[in-house]
Amino acid sequence: MIFFKHRRSAERDAFSVPRSVQKSIPIKRIYQDGVFQVSGKFSKTWRFFDVNYAVASPEKQRELFMTYCSFLNSLPIGATAKITLFNRQLNQKDFGRTLLMPMQGDHRDLYRNEYNALVLGKAAESNNLIQEKYITVSAEKKSVEEARAFFSRVGTDLTTGLSRMSSSVREITVNDRLRLLHDFYRPGEEQLFRFNLEDTMRRSHDFRDCIAPDCISFQKNHYELGDHVGRTLFLREYASFISDAMITELMDYPRNMMLSIDIIPVAMDEAVSDIRKRIMSVESDITRWQQRQNQSNNFTANIPYDLEQMRSEAKEFMDDLMSRDQRMMLALVTLTHLADNLEQLDQDTEALQAIGRARGCQFNILRYQQEDALNTVLPLGLKRIEATRTLTTECTAVLMPFKSQEIQDAGGIYYGVNAVSHNLIVCNRGNLLNGNGFITGVSGSGKSMAAKQEVSALALSTDHDIIIVDPEREYGELVRALGGEVITISASDPNGCHINALDLSEGYGDGREPLVMKSEFIMSLYEQLMGADKIEPQEKSIIDRSVGNIYREYLKNYQGQPPTLKDLYDDLMKQVNPEAHRIALALELFTVGSLNVFSHQTNINTKSRILCFDIQDLGENLKSVGLLVMLDAIYNRVIQNRREGKYTHVYIDEIYLFFANGSGSGHSITNYSSEFLYKCWKRFRKYGATLTGITQNVEECLLSNTARMMFANSEFLLMLNQATTDREQLARLLGASDTQMSYVDNAPAGHGLIKVGGAIVPFANELPKNTELYRLMSTKPGED
């Protein structure tokens, strides 16, 4: 039991007055892999990421809670785990550099100013906080080599345990760990951090120079840190029932602060021995009390309530250990917060204590212990406060650090505000393994607005190419305002714009025989013309043979003009078998008939980086064919951009047409059309492009297995208000809870769910109506 008692005590070095600010930082030695030596111990820190706990269903919350209990049970014996939540307010300089658009001196600066005003306004309304979560494990080891071997095993266990909660863990380097301390010690100067271990060693500099504040002074009940003041509190009184939301409620307070939960797991044999001694002690007290009562001839007196309660609690604790897979944990909760002045600090302290009192807990100020308290709360691996509380695993797990996933990518664009945490949602789709995605929602939910907002942000902040297929003539005005070009494809204008459906760029096919993929495209084209179930196997062979015939000369050197649908028609007519004539007859209307818009050589030669293909005038007979031809033309453009090192963003409205037959009935699911789209979907990622499908017909799309696969594998989904059947389909496909899906049930326009990677976050994105951007993007009748 001596070791057990030692773990309850504070870890202090022999006292000495620090001669400099650097000396007040209790780090003895650092190593390249992020291991620190502190007070005779070694420590290492990992960063872990939030999960959707607050918006999960009660059943899912219970599951997450029990998984977190299992994680706590897996923490190593003989070591201290410190879970740290670090809130820092968004640095204005970083904010301006990463989110605000610089002016370019062109006509689009008007829109950039409006965009910047929107983001600044939303940031002012939001918490404007960045929260990071860390776990630091510290242990006494004989050497750094022994410590590294120990931390390697611990890191594997942490990754395994937290991955079961859909959280990820990242081991942080020495630079990351020093940056974390620098950001706390020097708030507002985050961008100034510079450190190179080799240079520091070569120059014999103290590594603490790069993180130390200008000055630090510890007073009776607060400390001064540079131009700021701070105070550290500890959880003194625990409620008999603590809400699992208390920790996140504290961390929602909009100030720079850090909260740490020190957890020391106790070996089972030590815990059982300790509880047995407690039970024996209580029983002895009860026996002595009864003996005194007997001596007074009082044989009917009841055992005092406090003794009975102590016996009951001790036995319950023993039962938890022996029967309910609980472990004994020694826990300590400390919290430090910063303010600009002492008056504000006192107000913040009272507000934080009030949050605790509302949950039946009491946070007290550590008087004359502010230095030890600060070093305890920092993620160093130290515990210098004697205020541990004996808890079971479940009681410790109630101090839940999880709330809601955040989406805040570096170099991203603004998508709205997190409806749970009220922080900005900033996503960079280029960081995803597959940046392709969908925007879905019923009519009037704001899906066109969402797509246009993303298009606008990309057009104003990047030099990427943007290509839009617009079947409903919704994007033209915005594209022209952004300096792009609108190409109207019409079946009724013989002298208008034409796109050759059989264009073929060098490099077409992703390294495969280009003719194979082109043949598949023409199969999908015929599928749209004739119907998914109307093409017989022998007819497919005829089409494939004719495709080879008409491309034979062109593929030798890609010189001259590529063949057209008219050439394909002529080749089919030359053949003697009646099936070839049947196929040619199906093509006649689209080659020599009135709908021959795609049978001419391409007469579009635009260099504009923002293109909108307006295909509204194609009519219902040609719209699905037009979508397919547009996709093939875009595929050629993406290949060309790849060779030139350009990034391309492609938007296809009414994408459900790829999964429904060409007649527009929407009941017969196609094969080649959806497969061609899926191949483009997969290849675009390799070619430096993203493809976004926009639709309100989710259920109709999901009748296709290919569409289901595309939805399930999409790392980006923007879901606005959904119809009931669509909502049910998406919930099953994504494994989303009823609570999450409630955000797309009768949701106002611009509200819904956004899925980025593994994160599914409810969002709100309302644009101010008194802006030119809103006027260009709105499709509401009567809004001009």
Q: Would you name each region that the model predicts?
A:
Residues V51, P58-I77, R88, M251, ...:
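P-loop NTPase motor domains
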Residues N431, S443:
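The conserved Walker
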Residues I439:
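Hydrophobic anchor at the beta1->P-loop junction of P-loop NTPases
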Residues M1-F402:
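Extended, folded cores of ATP/NTP-driven motor/assembly subunits in large transport
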Residues A457-I467:
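Post-Walker A helix-loop "phosphate-sensing" segment adjacent to the P-loop in P-loop NTPases
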Residues K447:
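Conserved lysine of the Walker
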Residues A450:
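Hydrophobic positions on the alpha1 helix immediately C-terminal to the Walker A/P-loop
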Residues T488-D493, F716-T725:
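Conserved AAA+ ATPase "SRH/arginine-finger" region at the nucleotide-binding site
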